[in-house]
């Protein structure tokens, strides 16, 4: 089963796996699909390690990278905001609810609200940080970059163009897709509920 997108990306099957796990990304790509590594939890050094590992395990097959750069962000002007400070704003009732839900379903890690980010790291959706991750990614043979939170910034689209790599973005509604197309996004991913 082939399609124009399969031909464009050099894949055998139109199967895409968005994952934060390098093993999943590599396995899907190696099997003929297209693995996409979610990069938001990594700092540039960690991302380089992950991408080196993927490069060594995909036998030259294509894969991509997903970042989160929101169009709008309520905390955009708070330049001294850290991941720890942002996490402290989450009401305890919300944390308790999540803990109870995870425990009720036997999910490990209940009560652990920490991510793979240091306390003094910028919040995970900082545009500047995402652009640094893309710079690291383009030192590797990635074949697509994706923004999962709205219209990618012009600098991201230009970066993709400069490297000959298509830029994709996720759309949850027709209006989103129209805005993405108007911005010059190459591939629009129609997302729905799971």
Named regions from a protein language model:
Residues 1-194:
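Active-site entrance/lid segments in N-terminal catalytic domains of soluble metabolic enzymes
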């Amino acid at each position: 089963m082939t399609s124009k997108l399969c031909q464009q990306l050099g894949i055998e099957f139109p199967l895409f796996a968005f994952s934060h796990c390098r093993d999943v990304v590599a396995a899907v790509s190696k099997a003929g699909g297209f693995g996409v590594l979610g990069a938001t939890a990594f700092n540039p050094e960690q991302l380089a390690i992950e991408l080196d590992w993927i490069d060594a395990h995909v036998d030259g097959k294509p894969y991509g990278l997903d970042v989160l750069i929101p169009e709008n962000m309520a905390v955009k002007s708070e330049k001294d905001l850290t991941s720890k400070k942002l996490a402290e704003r989450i009401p305890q009732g919300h944390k308790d609810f999540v803990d109870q839900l995870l425990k009720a379903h036997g999910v490990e890690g209940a009560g652990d609200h920490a991510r793979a980010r240091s306390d003094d790291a910028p919040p995970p959706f900082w545009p500047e940080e995402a652009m640094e991750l893309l710079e690291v990614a383009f030192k590797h043979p990635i074949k697509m970059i994706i923004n999962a939170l709205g219209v990618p910034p012009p600098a991201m689209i230009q970066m993709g163009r400069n490297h000959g790599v298509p830029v994709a973005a996720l759309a949850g509604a027709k209006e989103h897709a129209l805005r993405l197309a108007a911005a010059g996004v190459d591939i629009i991913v129609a997302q729905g509920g799971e």
